[in-house]
């Protein structure tokens, strides 16, 4: 080997030979040589950098902090009573359940090591992981799970989750095993099992709504509360949280979180612009678009919400005529609503099932016809149905009836009232609908109400012709509440007051169908029936809008159903990162 290097060395010019060669160059030749050397150096450096990059990957590092801004004030930071968005956001960070919804939309074990389901779908048995702890260091046991579920089921607790647990019993098999027994199969039960678990030792003996742990929570989730700042009035300004290094799915990468609370959206936006918070959600599309235009990073995901016009045939007889609803569906410019009102943070829909409902293959019934063609179709439908535009510019219909050899003529007006909330998006949508329908000769009036008044004075007594309204469909079983005939009257949510015996049977069967393929077929049949009967005109599904830090990695909101779902995989988020070669990343 030494002889080899000596031979190579003898082939290279010596220092004196190189000096002699360089001294023989002219000034111009020296400059060319220097230039060539510089080009070679830069080229070599670039090649080395590119090779290095091709072998490098970015990996998350533990550490860093994140400040999140939220509108509202938390009051019940516990999974049994959480009501507001602020409550639910903190609850999702502090608590964990037997299962957790993963970013794919499927459910994975969380506190549970495993679970089994009986063949008849009536029994779910969960086995807890070893060495699982609450933030104060006490172990999580089967007793804590049973205590939490019984608190939810207790009518005196008035938990908003109670209806999900009616008819379900829970029993302790041993210290690590819990069994749930159902009266009938329930395809959404694994979602029930995501409810956060309370430490029984802290909550026992005190009325749940009065316990100090409502604002000083201790759970087993990815983050634990380390501090709270309150105003002199007792209103909470912010919470500080730290990663829980015994979280069963792994210690979170981000070390510290601060959740800051603001009374309204304007104050929230000011905090973002002033750098007091890094991230915010729940903004109107208009404000989100303004922030996007000045460089903020926005992530969005379509929510399982169905906004539409729901018709009350009992109050407005014109809606018993399907031709009228068919014409309305053609005439309403849904694309314009999504573009102008939602700023494209949403999608148009034609069906009662949200476009991103898991495991449901949407029927593609979109058309490629132009707006002008749709208007012509709408007018043609109404003309064929006997509606004629009068001198006042609106449609009228004259019908002739004979009774006892006497002929009677009566004239109907194609006029109705849209009732809706006073939220900006609803008001703007209602005005576009009115403009679209006026264009084809319908006379439309709009009545807007404060949301609470809309519910009490309009929705509950069913006093409306057409209701511009949104349905929140977190899972398939919610469709029962919105479309089964048993839910037509208050407190039911069937605001279209829809009745169809076939649909009732489909929804009843779907609730107890565990096999996913069969359940999907049933919901496809349900959708066919709704589209045939046309009890509503479906308009759009809005998106969840999230302004996030540009340094944030690991966020996945593709399958969220509620705003707090954005934190489902927060333990995988990171704000600190480094580059290493691929071979060292495993």
Report each predicted region and the residues it spans.
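Aromatic- and charge-enriched surface segment that lines or borders ligand/interaction sites
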Residues: 2-11, 113-158, 179, 318-320
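Detector for C-terminal structural segments
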Residues: 49, 331-364, 424-434, 457-586
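A structural "hinge/loop" feature
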Residues: 53, 72-88, 111-112, 138, ...
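N-terminal lobe/hinge region of extracytoplasmic solute-binding protein
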Residues: 69-119, 150, 218
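Surface-exposed binding/hinge segments that line
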Residues: 161-205
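Gly/Pro-rich hinge or "lid" segments in bacterial periplasmic/extracellular proteins
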Residues: 194-256, 266, 274, 375-384, ...
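Append "and occasionally in soluble cytosolic enzymes with long acidic Gly/Pro-rich linkers
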Residues: 229, 235-243, 321-435, 525, ...
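Ligand-site clamp/hinge motif
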Residues: 244-290, 434, 443-445
């Amino acid at each position: 080997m030494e002889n080899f290097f000596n031979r190579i060395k003898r082939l290279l010019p010596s220092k004196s030979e190189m000096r002699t060669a360089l001294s023989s160059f002219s000034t111009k030749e020296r400059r060319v040589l220097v230039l060539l050397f510089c080009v070679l150096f830069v080229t070599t450096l670039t090649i080395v950098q590119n090779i290095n990059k091709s072998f490098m990957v970015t990996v998350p590092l533990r550490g860093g902090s994140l400040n999140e801004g939220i509108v509202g004030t938390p009051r019940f930071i516990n999974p049994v009573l959480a009501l507001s968005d602020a409550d639910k956001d903190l609850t999702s960070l502090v608590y964990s359940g037997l299962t957790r919804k993963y970013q794919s939309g499927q459910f994975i074990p969380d506190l549970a090591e495993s679970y089994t389901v009986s063949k008849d779908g009536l029994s779910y048995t969960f086995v807890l992981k070893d060495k699982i702890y609450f933030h104060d260091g006490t172990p999580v046991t089967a007793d804590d799970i049973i205590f939490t579920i019984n608190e939810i089921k207790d009518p005196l607790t008035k938990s908003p989750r109670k209806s999900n647990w009616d008819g379900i019993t829970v029993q302790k098999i041993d210290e690590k095993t819990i069994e749930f027994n159902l009266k009938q199969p329930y395809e959404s039960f694994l979602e029930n099992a995501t409810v956060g678990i309370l430490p029984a030792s802290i909550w026992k003996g005190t009325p749940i709504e009065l316990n100090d742990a409502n604002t000083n929570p201790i759970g087993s989730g990815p983050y634990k509360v380390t501090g709270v700042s309150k105003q002199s009035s007792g209103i909470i300004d912010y919470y500080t949280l730290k990663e829980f290094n015994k979280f069963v799915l792994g210690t979170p990468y981000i070390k510290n979180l601060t959740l800051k609370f603001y009374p309204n959206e304007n104050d929230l936006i000011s905090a973002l612009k002033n750098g007091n918070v890094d991230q915010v959600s729940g903004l109107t599309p208009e404000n989100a678009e303004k922030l996007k235009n000045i460089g903020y990073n926005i992530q969005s995901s379509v929510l399982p919400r169905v906004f539409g016009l729901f018709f009350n045939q009992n109050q407005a007889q014109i809606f018993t005529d399907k031709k009228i609803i068919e014409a309305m569906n053609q005439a309403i410019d849904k694309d314009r609503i999504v573009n102008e009102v939602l700023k494209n943070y949403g999608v148009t829909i034609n069906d009662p099932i949200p476009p991103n409902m898991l495991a449901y293959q949407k029927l593609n019934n979109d058309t490629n016809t132009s707006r002008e063609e749709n208007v012509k179709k709408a007018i043609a439908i109404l003309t064929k149905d006997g509606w004629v535009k009068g001198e006042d510019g609106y449609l009228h219909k004259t019908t002739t009836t004979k009774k006892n050899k006497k002929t009677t003529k009566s004239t109907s007006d194609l006029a109705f009232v849209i009732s809706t909330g006073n939220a900006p998006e609803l008001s703007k949508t209602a005005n576009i609908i009115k403009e679209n329908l006026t264009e084809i000769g319908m006379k439309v009036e709009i009545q807007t109400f404060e949301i609470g008044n809309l519910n009490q004075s309009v929705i509950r007594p069913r006093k409306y012709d057409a209701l511009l309204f949104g349905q929140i469909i977190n899972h398939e079983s919610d469709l029962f509440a919105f479309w089964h005939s048993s839910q037509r009257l208050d407190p039911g949510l069937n605001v279209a007051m829809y009745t169809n015996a076939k649909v009732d049977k489909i929804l009843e069967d779907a609730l107890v169908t565990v096999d996913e393929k069969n359940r999907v077929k049933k919901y496809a049949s349900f959708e066919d029936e709704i589209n045939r009967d046309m009890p509503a005109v479906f308009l759009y599904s809005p998106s969840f809008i999230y302004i996030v830090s540009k340094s944030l990695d690991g966020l996945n909101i593709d399958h969220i159903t509620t705003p707090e779902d954005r934190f489902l995989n927060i333990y995988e988020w990171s704000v600190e990162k480094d580059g290493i070669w691929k071979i060292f990343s495993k």
